[in-house]
Amino acid sequence: MAYEPQFNPGETKIAENRRKHMNPNYELKKLREIADEDIVRVLGHRSPGESFKTVHPPLEEMDFEEDPMKDIVEPIEGAKQGTRIRYIQFADSMYNAPAQPYDRARTYMWRFRGVDTGTLSGRQVIEMRELDLEKVSKILLETEIFDPARCGIRGATVHGHSLRFDENGLMFDALQRYIYDEDSGHVVYVKDQVGRPLDQPVDMGEPLPEDELKEITTIYRKDNIGMREDEELLEVVNKIHEARTIGGFGMEVFKKDLNKRLGGANE
């Protein structure tokens, strides 16, 4: 019988949204159009039109000794061409952002190949070959995973995910990488992801309305759908907590040694 991954436990809308993100067979809804050159500008790793820098020759030109992995694993395009490793990093507001760090990590690992991802409380980085990174970044910025007001592209100085919004509903950004254009109603990036001024602004589109964000968010919140409303999720979390506590501390395994260290008899 073929294995069908569940992706994420839970019976609520929040759980279903998480499953949609992680499921590579689910087509993420495209919400905006961003030019490839604009994505390159915001990433800040190279200039539009500039060739990709490489760190080794194309794989087909390299002389490999016996290495079974090269026959087992199909390299991604950037690896084939030898392009360098680069990154994009997001900060997601805890106030109903479409994605959040652990959701991003699991989504990246399910959907993309050749990725290295790091998870922190208020930011999520994805590193991969630059050629492939730009293609992945386009997906992450144009689809329902991203909202220009609640998600920030921040390679440095990421603070703001837990802070209140400004008067235009934008998440706080200490480097002020983006602004709200009152004429168009769109969020516009005026700096790249590490805070360097751009030669020309990049339009990221209109922020999603609050009602829609509550429908697509992957964050449990008391003022939307609380975690305690999801019985299946709570059951899984409790099982993991119990297994880690009992098995992780290994109280039974080290019972005699622990008793001796506490001054008791070594039975």
Curated annotation (Swiss-Prot):
UniProt xrefs under SUPFAM superfamilies? Methyl-coenzyme M reductase subunits
Asked if the keyword Cell inner membrane belongs to this entry, the reply reads no
- Per the record, the domain of life is Archaea
Q: Which cofactor does it need?
A: coenzyme F430
GO MF assignments = coenzyme-B sulfoethylthiotransferase activity
What EC number(s) would the UniProt record show?
Answer: 2.8.4.1
Some GO term, biological process aspect, for this entry: which one? methanogenesis
- Give one Pfam family, short name only: MCR_gamma
Bound cofactor: record note: Binds 2 coenzyme F430 non-covalently per MCR complex. Coenzyme F430 is a yellow nickel porphinoid. Methyl-coenzyme-M reductase is activated when the enzyme-bound coenzyme F430 is reduced to the Ni(I) oxidation state.
Quaternary structure and interacting proteins, as annotated: MCR is a hexamer of two alpha, two beta, and two gamma chains, forming a dimer of heterotrimers.
Role this protein plays = Component of the methyl-coenzyme M reductase (MCR) I that catalyzes the reductive cleavage of methyl-coenzyme M (CoM-S-CH3 or 2-(methylthio)ethanesulfonate) using coenzyme B (CoB or 7-mercaptoheptanoylthreonine phosphate) as reductant which results in the production of methane and the mixed heterodisulfide of CoB and CoM (CoM-S-S-CoB). This is the final step in methanogenesis.
Give the protein name, as stated in the record: Methyl-coenzyme M reductase II subunit gamma
State the encoding gene.
mrtG
